[in-house]
Structure formats: structure tokens, C-alpha cells
């Protein structure tokens, strides 16, 4: 039995992939292969999107020079643990339709689907992913060459092989466990959202 299985219990018969995947901070510094990185983005490529606009953009760092630049975008507690990740990814959502210039209302939703596809594929490869809101969003545009007029900075992602909890700063040891989820009954309602 894995730690995930000991802590998490599905309420329905879902694929174990959904329950076993969790967002580790402890990541091994071992580099990922070009083939592994390609597979992650191939999974993201096949995510569904409204009108097939595929509004996501991923800028990643896996080489020493680009990793050094990417680490400067981390902030807060993320600096302490994510700096050792062998792959850092920054995710953006396109703001406007490429043909009409109209706002893409579903861009963030669709970009989230692409990130989820990447995360599940990473788990299938024996890798761990952790999304980070704690990045210098305002600096991502210039440092990564992404036009702010066209894209919105969403998240950073640290990716790597699972590492040892003891590699983390002591204050993060207790938090390095899979967490639980709300019951489906708390967020899925047939017909109408009930009055509270």
C-alpha cells in the first residue's frame, strides 16, 4: 500500500492514477531526458479546448543556464524546495482569439486542462509535478520572452523524480504528504445548486 492509498480513499471506482498522483515538493535533482520532456508536452497537446483554440503556452527550463534564469522567477517558500527541480515550466494562457482579437473566455479553463494532462502523464512516467502560484508573474514576460499583451501568466510547475522528504527544509517535512479531497457531494449537484 502506498502513502497515497493509506491517506486517500476514492468514493467511486476511478482509475488509481487520479488518487495516487499528488504534488510533492521533494524532487530528485536527476535530469530528465529529452524524450521524457517531449512526452509531457505531447500529453498537454492533446488536452481538450473550446473551439480547438489550444490557448496554452509552456516555456520550460531544463538546461543549466535556463534553469538559473527560471529559478529567479520563484518566490516565497518555493525558492527553498523548487530550486532543485530538474525541470521548471511556466504556463501562460492566450488572452485573445488569434483571428478575431476577441477575448478567449475559456482560455484559463482550457490551459488548466493542458496542465492536468501534463501532470497525469508525468505521474505515469514515475515523475512528480507541483504547480506554483508563488512566482514573479510580472517578471515572467520579459525574462521568458512572452508578450504580455497576448498572454497571461498562470503558474509555474516544478517537475522531477520523487525525492526524499528529508531533502526539504525541516519546516516542510510534515506537509510532505498527500492531502485529502472534499466529498463529491460537496461540489456536484443534480439539477440545481441547493440553497444554503
What are these regions (language model features)?
Residues 1-196:
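Acidic, surface-exposed loops and disordered segments
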Amino acid at each position: 500500500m502506498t502513502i497515497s492509498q493509506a491517506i486517500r480513499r476514492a468514493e467511486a471506482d476511478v482509475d488509481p492514477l487520479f488518487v495516487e498522483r499528488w504534488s510533492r515538493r521533494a524532487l530528485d535533482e536527476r535530469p530528465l531526458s529529452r524524450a521524457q520532456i517531449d512526452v509531457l508536452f505531447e500529453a498537454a497537446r492533446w488536452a481538450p479546448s473550446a473551439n480547438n483554440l489550444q490557448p496554452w503556452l509552456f516555456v520550460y527550463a531544463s538546461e543549466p543556464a535556463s534553469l538559473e534564469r527560471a529559478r529567479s522567477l520563484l518566490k516565497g517558500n518555493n525558492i527553498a524546495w523548487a530550486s532543485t527541480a530538474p525541470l521548471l515550466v511556466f504556463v501562460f494562457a492566450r488572452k485573445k482569439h488569434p483571428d478575431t482579437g476577441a477575448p478567449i473566455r475559456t482560455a484559463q479553463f482550457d490551459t488548466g486542462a493542458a496542465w492536468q494532462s501534463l501532470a497525469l502523464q508525468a505521474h505515469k512516467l514515475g515523475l512528480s509535478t507541483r504547480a506554483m502560484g508563488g512566482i514573479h508573474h510580472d517578471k515572467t514576460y520579459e525574462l521568458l520572452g512572452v508578450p504580455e499583451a497576448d498572454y497571461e501568466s498562470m503558474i509555474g510547475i516544478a517537475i522531477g523524480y520523487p525525492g526524499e522528504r528529508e531533502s526539504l527544509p525541516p519546516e516542510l517535512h510534515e506537509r510532505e504528504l498527500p492531502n485529502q479531497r472534499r466529498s463529491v457531494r460537496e461540489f456536484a449537484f443534480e439539477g440545481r445548486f441547493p440553497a444554503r
